[in-house]
């Protein structure tokens, strides 16, 4: 691993759906999610994003704002994002109100992530037509940004009505709350983000189709930003990919085998199909790092060097982005999950931030000038002896006489 400066993202964080096995204690699972955000804060990660889901059993955070309010009490620096609020599920004024409250409780550390909603089961329970979800997301965003700017809004659609609606509490952050729009393969998210000057949150960067869509979606985003008078800034682009690290690849594979079964079961039940590679944990992990899993893409399960290689590949493919987010999947046990977070912070983050570049340059300078420096040091010592030699000799002589 090199610690010299590298092109690539300069900020890192976690993206937590989160996914939890159906076995175990859900209360303790949520506590470990909070502990992971707390650990990320101590280790210097910049961001933590937390999702919103309402069905299928594994993704058990229904209100990311509530979870993040709890996380804010345990942390001091890390920024906290809703990853993401499913806009068709919420009356826009109520959602804006809750996020402004969270921004004040976190003293300006809140980020708002938005999307159409991922799980068909969530939409079905709410009586929402999946065909309408992206249109509903656009309709909600149109008034959300106005409310967050402090405007008074009167608007009506077939699913919400606002009459002279205004927020009584605006965001804590003077420049407004940072917003990001979820993007996978279709250009819908890129269009919405560009229209409103929000950041882009690419959730499927490690999926083969999502990987190929990175550049087309960026071009749509860039074009839409410019059409609406917004500044193009790659630092506001976030990419998400699953990773688990250990000291060796074999250890990382063994770690992932511990819990990969719950993801396989989840994929099979949501798709209604049996995965041929899901018969054993080892086969499942090999599939995941090879061709990848449906919806979850390809995982990097290996060493910090493997993580660096993956991020560099994403950088090359995308043309550059600002933040890399590790998708938290709870496939390893708690101790191994913490160790993975520490390895990433210790070795991967400094590689891209160049945290040690001046230390390395300082040692290289000392090496290149060592002969001159040592010569000068020796000359200085000799000069001191020449200058004070008589005094030293006299002191030694007096000491001998005293004996």
Please describe what each predicted stretch is.
Residues 47-71, 86, 118, 205-210, ...:
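Glycine-rich, proline-tolerant flexible connector loops at the mouths of alpha/beta enzymes
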Residues 2-8, 131-167, 210-322, 349-403:
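An alpha-helical appendage that flanks or caps ligand/catalytic pockets
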Residues 40, 44, 52, 71, ...:
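Conserved, mostly hydrophobic/aromatic
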């Amino acid at each position: 691993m090199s610690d010299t400066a590298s092109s690539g993202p300069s900020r890192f964080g976690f993206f937590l759906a989160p996914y939890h096995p159906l076995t175990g204690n859900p209360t303790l699972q949520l506590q470990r999610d909070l502990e992971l955000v707390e650990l990320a804060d101590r280790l210097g990660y910049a961001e933590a994003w937390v999702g919103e889901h309402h069905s299928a059993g594994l993704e058990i955070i229904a209100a990311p704002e509530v979870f993040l309010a709890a996380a804010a009490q345990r942390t001091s620096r890390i920024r906290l994002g809703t990853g993401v609020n499913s806009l068709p599920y919420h009356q826009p004024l109520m959602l804006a109100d809750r996020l402004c409250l969270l921004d004040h409780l976190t003293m300006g550390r809140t980020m708002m992530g938005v999307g159409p909603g991922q799980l068909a089961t969530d939409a079905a329970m709410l009586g929402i037509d999946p065909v309408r979800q992206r249109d509903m997301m656009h309709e909600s965003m149109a008034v959300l940004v106005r409310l967050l700017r402090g405007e008074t809004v009167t608007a009506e659609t077939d699913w919400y009505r606002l009459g002279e609606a205004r927020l009584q509490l605006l965001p804590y952050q003077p420049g407004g709350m940072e917003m990001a729009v979820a993007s996978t393969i279709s250009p819908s998210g890129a269009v919405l983000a560009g229209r409103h000057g929000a950041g882009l949150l690419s959730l499927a960067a490690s999926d083969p189709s999502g990987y190929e869509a990175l550049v087309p979606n960026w071009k749509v985003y860039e074009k839409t930003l410019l059409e609406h008078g917004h500044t193009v800034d790659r630092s506001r682009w976030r990419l998400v990919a699953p990773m688990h690290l250990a000291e060796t690849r074999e250890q990382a594979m063994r770690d992932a085998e511990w819990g990969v079964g719950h993801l396989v079961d989840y994929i099979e039940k949501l798709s209604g199909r049996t995965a041929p590679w899901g018969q054993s944990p080892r086969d499942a992990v090999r599939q995941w790092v090879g061709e990848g899993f449906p919806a979850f893409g390809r995982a990097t399960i290996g060493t910090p060097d493997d993580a660096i290689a993956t991020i560099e590949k994403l950088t090359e493919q995308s043309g550059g982005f600002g933040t890399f987010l590790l998708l938290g999947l709870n496939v390893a046990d708690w101790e191994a999950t913490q160790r993975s977070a520490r390895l990433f912070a210790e070795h991967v983050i400094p590689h891209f931030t160049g945290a040690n570049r001046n230390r390395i340059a300082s040692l290289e300078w000392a090496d290149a000038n060592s002969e001159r420096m040592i010569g000068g040091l020796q000359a200085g010592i000799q000069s001191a002896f020449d200058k004070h030699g008589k005094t030293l000799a006299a002191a030694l002589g007096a000491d001998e006489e005293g004996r």
